[in-house]
């Protein structure tokens, strides 16, 4: 038993399938089956008005213009490689910035290690007062137990 009044026929000239759940194109307002409802599948003449996507750079939040026929991922990738201001790979921040205060030592550390007595900044090797010959008024004493 068929229900010719139920559903709608696909508007694609080569299809005309009776579809019980047709999809109406929001650009040309015609009904299509699931295979022909995308703009490209039925060659929608009004798709240029609707199918507009502007990708945004995930690093700097800048909209990236994409020309027709270009792949958005490739264009955004090119932007990140060339023009992006927030590219983390381009930042040349120095990691080892804390130089040892011990005379003759040229080591640098990521973390600041300040002597509690003389308040100088030292590397791991010279961080203890005895190791950097701390010249503060109170000398550290070693207790034998």
UniProtKB/Swiss-Prot annotation:
Keyword annotations of the record: Cytoplasm, Metal-binding, Nucleus, Repeat, Zinc, Zinc-finger
Binding site for Zn(2+) 2: 25, 28, 42, 44
GO cellular component, one term: cytoplasm
Binding positions (Zn(2+) 3): 100, 105, 123, 126
SMART domains linked: ZnF_AN1
Name listed for the protein in its UniProt record: AN1-type zinc finger protein 2A
GO biological process: cellular response to arsenic-containing substance; positive regulation of proteasomal ubiquitin-dependent protein catabolic process; proteasome-mediated ubiquitin-dependent protein catabolic process; protein targeting to ER
Residues annotated as binding Zn(2+) 4: 115, 118, 132, 134
Domain of life of the native organism: Eukaryota
Main localisation: cytoplasm
Entry binding sites for Zn(2+) 1: 10, 15, 33, 36
GO MF assignments: zinc ion binding
UniProt-listed Pfam families: zf-AN1, zf-C2H2_ZFAND2
Lineage of producing organism: Eukaryota, Metazoa, Chordata, Craniata, Vertebrata
Localization in the cell: Cytoplasm; Nucleus
Keyword Lyase: no
InterPro entries, A to Z: AN1-like_Znf, Znf_AN1
Zinc finger extent (AN1-type): 4-52, 94-142
């Amino acid at each position: 038993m068929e229900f010719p009044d139920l559903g709608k026929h696909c508007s694609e000239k080569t299809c005309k399938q009776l579809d019980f759940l047709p999809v109406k194109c929001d650009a040309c307002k015609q009904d299509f089956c699931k295979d022909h409802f995308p703009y490209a599948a039925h060659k929608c003449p009004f798709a240029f008005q609707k199918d507009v996507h502007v990708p945004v750079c995930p690093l700097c939040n800048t909209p990236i213009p994409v020309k027709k026929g270009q792949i958005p991922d490739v264009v955004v990738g090119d932007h990140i490689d060339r023009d992006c201001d927030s590219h983390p790979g381009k930042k040349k921040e120095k990691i080892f910035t804390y130089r040892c205060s011990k005379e003759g030592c040229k080591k640098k550390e990521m973390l600041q290690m300040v002597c509690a007595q003389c308040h100088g900044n030292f590397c791991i090797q010279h961080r203890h007062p005895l190791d950097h010959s701390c010249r503060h008024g109170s000398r550290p004493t070693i207790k034998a137990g």
